[in-house]
Amino acid sequence: MNPRYPAVSHRAVHRCEYCHAPEGIFNLPFEVEHVIPISRAGTDGETNLALACRSCNLHKSDHVTGIDQMGKPAVRLFHPRQDDWEEHFIVELETGRVEGRTDIGRATVACLCMNEPLQLAARRQWISLGFYE
């Protein structure tokens, strides 16, 4: 386990900092990821680390930009240390969809594939059980 996991997970209130999946209902801890990848001149500093579920971390990979579905190319992705989640995203409680409110939000939702069928089914279940905020 990453030695920074305790501090990063506590700061994130044990939820994915991208899709807000609740870590407590998974059978494995979430991953500490580099918001700006080391391969793209990111650092190991606390301000460049985020807690991510496996799905978001795999899809994010080394991406730092994405395509806004409204047609804007090369939009920077959501940065958990610099951006406010509620400003960029909203969750439709009936469908479980995470929707981008801004170009950053839309590009992040698309790049991280936040609304895949299995994720939507899980998110609807979490919402119905009161685990998803």
Model-flagged regions — what are they?
Residues 18-20:
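Right-handed parallel beta-helix
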Residues 26-30:
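A short coil-to-beta-strand element that immediately follows conserved catalytic motifs
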Residues 1-7, 36-43:
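Short, intrinsically disordered, charge-biased short linear motifs at domain edges
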Residues 2-7, 11, 22-25, 47, ...:
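Extended charged
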